[in-house]
Amino acid sequence: MNTSPRTLKTIAILGQPNVGKSSLFNRLAKERIAITSDFVGTTRDINKRKITLNGHEVELLDTGGMAKDAFLSKEIKAFNLKAAQMSDLILYVVDGKSIPSDEDIKLFREIFKINPNCFLVINKIDNDKEKERSYAFSSFGMPKSFNISVSHNRGISALIDAILDALGLTKIIEQDLDIDILESLETPNNTEDGNNEEEIIQVGIIGRVNVGKSSLLNVLTQKERSIVSSVAGTTIDPIDETILVKNQKICFVDTAGIRHKGKILGIEKYALERTQKALEKSHIALLVLDVSAPFVELDEKISSLADKHSLGIILILNKWDIRYAPYEEIMATLKRKFRFLEYAPVITTSCLKTRHIEEIKHKIIEVYECFSKRIPTSLLNSVISQATQKHPLPSDGGKLVKVYYATQFATKPPQISLVMNRPKALHFSYKRYLINTLRKEFNFLGTPLIINAKDKKSVQQN
């Protein structure tokens, strides 16, 4: 336990791999600093950050997960235990969707002996129904635990209050923020339009190895920032470059090429983790496809990254000057294989001949405007009402299904809630119909639309 005279309090985030430590670190720091992924042992180093919690500056430490089979596990565990001893408070994070293991309990008790100033933080409790899962963690022997969901921003404010109380810091109220309303929005993206800071459009360039991503970055920025080579996998770390188009800043990130999992070895695995991090903070993805040869299955799998991260998307058909087939055949194949991206604009290009490069820049701005669009509530409800009248909602076991009203609660990407009497009865096919209707009425070029249904009673209670 830390007994030094310094005034800056230190908080260490500990726990097994892949339980959400880095995500919690990012949430508390209000930045995406630590790499977060599904790989065990993603965080290899200590991430240290001075942050402000309700007006108080503290030091936050995110440490590597301590699994027996993890890389450098003994060294990481020893370093973690030392961090626990030196910290003023420990946040021990567990996965609320998993059953606690004997190893996890043993590790927690070992840390608790070193420093009893310890909170048990049960992550991934995404809604009230999942709270009962937290009872399984009573075996840790903590009289009080904290149920949170980092991805849904639930329970974070209560945890922060408890942290400040444990550290002997008085809460400073900076603004009148309705925390309850913020936490009731069960979505990781709660972006509002009222940000006065200058927005930089973040664009991730994705694709298989050697399809021309680095060449595209070079011609877009007119710089030789990326090494261009015929050797697959030349780009390891994401390389970023900012340009100005129509007084709008655009930051391009050239990510490592993606190949089949069976071929991913050593540093390429690290590169993929960095690619995931780059996409997490991107607004738009440029999916680069090599048309000098037919599309492959991996192209389709990579395209799903844009959907996974809810990004705007533009399809770039590179090496058009040496395309393998006529225009009509390539476009027909593209439409068939990438049917779920039919809303994405398509641009043919040749980096060697700088074909359509300026068009790509202007299309990015157009897609970003759609990505940031907010539909006036009255207009949105008018369109939804007309759509449900034209094609009524299917009944639910013979009972009438109604949409009372719709509201757009977020942008980047646009997210819409339908307040209904029977939200579970909203079939995915009808949701797709509503999305297509909105696309026809409003220009959502290259932009994913997210629609969810909420029960009227729960909305009224909230």
Swiss-Prot record:
Keywords: GTP-binding, Nucleotide-binding, Repeat, Ribosome biogenesis. Residues 9-171, 201-372 form the EngA-type G domain. Signal peptide: none annotated. The keyword Nucleotide-binding applies. One of its GO terms (biological process) is ribosome biogenesis. GTP 1 binds at residues 15-22, 62-66, 123-126. Residues 373-457 form the KH-like domain. GTP 2 binds at residues 207-214, 254-258, 318-321. GO terms for molecular function: GTP binding; ribosome binding. CDD domains: EngA1, EngA2. The keyword GTP-binding applies. SUPFAM superfamilies: P-loop containing nucleoside triphosphate hydrolases (SSF52540). Belongs to the TRAFAC class TrmE-Era-EngA-EngB-Septin-like GTPase superfamily. EngA (Der) GTPase family. GTPase that plays an essential role in the late steps of ribosome biogenesis. Associates with the 50S ribosomal subunit. This is GTPase Der.
